[in-house]
Amino acid sequence: MFKKIISIVALILCVCLAFSGCDSVTTLLSGADAEVEYKIENGEAHVKTVPNKSTVTQIVIPDEYEGVPVTKIADFSAANLEYVTKIYIGKNVKEIGTWSMTNNQHITAFEVDENNPYFCDVDGVIYTKDMKTLIFYPPAKDLTDAKDGDGKDIKVSKYTISDGVEIIRSKAFYKCANLIELNIPASVKRIEEKAFFRCERMENLILPEALEFIGKDAFSYCYGLREINISANVKEIGEYAFYNCTNLKTVNVDNSESNLILGEKWFPTDNGLDIKDLKISWK
């Protein structure tokens, strides 16, 4: 009799889930089971901590928490998650910290509520609603099998950024080590701090002519890069922009050195030391 009752309850639960809206799913994934912690401040809830548990593979940031809108995903609140494969972002989130969802190596997609006026997702990638800024790329998106130079099995991915994007935000591709090919549209003007930090396999990158700014550590530890062409429109390159890009031996700059704002050791180095056969060509 007891087993029969349990079966009936389970069946009812399944039916309810099948026909329920997003609010019910939000309750299940962001409630006690997921143990998401929030901080309420000035009538708004901010995501403070997301649990790193093997039992939690999807996280939903709800529209509201305790009757107030959830408006912010704080820095480091949903970072370094080992098991999460997808994060859903509610309609009231208007601020996503640059460190908030970094180094989540198993995330295949982000999903943003279509009624969110600040952000959207395109094929699992977060952009601002106006499609001018790329916010976060999921590290495990569209992985395919491949072989590395030593014949070892690896997973790789390729991506084309949407046309019209002007800013690749800080840490947008942070530690996307499986990304081997990236197409950047002609519209991009800014690549911000640590945007491609440790994209270790990325090769044959073409920087657009319209690019004006390359941030600090933008390409640090991008071992796959071998040659970079920097257009005359670039006005500033931040410190350590190409730190530890040990295979990047050719840098062509279509400008004179005196015309640029150059951060400390902006050029390729080997753990901060000069690379002997590095060639930097100025106009």
Describe the role of every protein-language-model region.
Residues F76, T98-S100, R169-A172, E192-F197, ...:
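Consensus positions within tandem repeat domains that build extended binding/scaffold surfaces
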Residues E35-E44, S54-K72, L81-E95, N104-V125, ...:
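Structural signature of tandem-repeat unit edges
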Residues H46-K48:
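Non-globular, low-complexity intrinsically disordered regions
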Residues F2, S24-L29, A78, W266-F267:
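Short, aromatic- and cysteine-enriched interfacial helices/patches
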Residues F2-D23:
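Sec-dependent N-terminal signal peptides of Gram-positive bacterial secreted proteins and lipoproteins
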Residues A18-A34:
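Sec-dependent signal peptide cleavage junction
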Residues L13-V15, G21, K175, R198, ...:
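The N-terminal extracellular segments of secreted preproproteins, especially immediately downstream
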